[in-house]
Amino acid sequence: MKKVKLNDENIHKGYLILINPDNLLKTNEIKLISYSEKYKNIELDQVANSQLQKALKSINANDEIVPISGVRTFEEQKRLYTDSIIENGEEYTKKFVALPNASEHQTGLAIDLALNKPNIDFICPSFPYNGICQEFRKIAPNFGFIERYKDEKKNITKIAKEEWHFRFVGYPHSKIITNKDLCLEEYIEYL
């Protein structure tokens, strides 16, 4: 494996940008592209989208896995948070919905995916640990994606387990994070 030296300046931007309540988004300069013709309203960073398409094609996912949420503006994240408090309560919302400028969705590097079925839950879509979803989970690191929020890391990430939420960090970072069973916060410290 090729070694790459990163300094602090390079760690906290680009594909390794860490966005959470302790590291709020400051700027939002990203090149977005629609996920697909069918899902024009869901946008991602161009490279992340390309890698996601390749990953799904590699397992012949077709329409079995569908995108639920890509990039969100500050206003969209604020509305989602506020609406969730009204509909689901504060405790639930704090577990599953990030505050505005604390959401990775504002970077264009995060995607929520779901098993394609009727009545998909927008906040907690079904993405089980079997079948085509598990196949995606296994190959995702080869294409630069990590499963971002795991149950055993919630004390670090401050977000409950979200098996549907994938974050593009690029390769080889995705492989290292997965192989060492780290969350992004731990990986940034590791670097």
PLM regions with names:
Residues 1-191:
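Extracytoplasmic cell-surface/polysaccharide-interacting catalytic and binding patches
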